[in-house]
């Protein structure tokens, strides 16, 4: 009985090992996971086109309210009010002009 189970185990082992040897992917299938250097450089150059002079990120637009915001930050009353109701409403209440 032991020899029969040992032979069966050896046969299963040989069968499994032969399947693993034949299970390697062919060259055409494994090449699909990678791209050529030319295709890769096209992708990188396409992405660089959207960056600002190679600095890493597009340049932000200047905020037109920044000078008013700095004036409001220098006034403690306006700064405190801006924390509660927002910058534009606080600036309008303190200085009386619309932003």
From Swiss-Prot:
GO cellular component, one term: dendrite
SUPFAM superfamilies reported for this sequence: GLA-domain (SSF57630)
Residue ranges the record assigns to the propeptide: 24-49
Domain of life: Eukaryota
Domain Gla, chain residue ranges per copy: 50-96
Residues involved in Ca(2+) 3 binding: 73, 79
Species of the source: Rattus norvegicus (Rat)
Disulphide bond pairs: 72-78
Purpose: The carboxylated form is one of the main organic components of the bone matrix, which constitutes 1-2% of the total bone protein: it acts as a negative regulator of bone formation and is required to limit bone formation without impairing bone resorption or mineralization. The carboxylated form binds strongly to apatite and calcium. The uncarboxylated form acts as a hormone secreted by osteoblasts, which regulates different cellular processes, such as energy metabolism, male fertility and brain development. Regulates of energy metabolism by acting as a hormone favoring pancreatic beta-cell proliferation, insulin secretion and sensitivity and energy expenditure.
Keyword Ubl conjugation appears in the UniProt entry: no
Similarity comment: Belongs to the osteocalcin/matrix Gla protein family.
SMART domains: GLA
List of residues that carry 4-carboxyglutamate: 66, 70, 73
Post-translational modification Hydroxyproline, affected residues: 58
Protein name: Osteocalcin
GO molecular function: calcium ion binding; calcium-dependent protein binding; hormone activity; hydroxyapatite binding; structural constituent of bone; transition metal ion binding
InterPro entries: GLA-like_dom_SF, GLA_domain, Osteocalcin, Osteocalcin/MGP
Residues holding Ca(2+) 1: 66
């Amino acid at each position: 009985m032991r020899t029969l189970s040992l032979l069966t185990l050896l046969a299963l082992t040989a069968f499994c090992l032969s399947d693993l040897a034949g299970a390697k992917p062919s060259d055409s299938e494994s090449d699909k996971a990678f791209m050529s250097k030319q295709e890769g450089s096209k992708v990188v150059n396409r992405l660089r086109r959207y960056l600002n002079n190679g600095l890493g990120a597009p340049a932000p637009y200047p905020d037109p309210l920044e000078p008013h915001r700095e004036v409001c930050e220098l006034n403690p009353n306006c700064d405190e009010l801006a924390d509660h109701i927002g910058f534009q409403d606080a600036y309008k209440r303190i200085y009386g002009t619309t932003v």
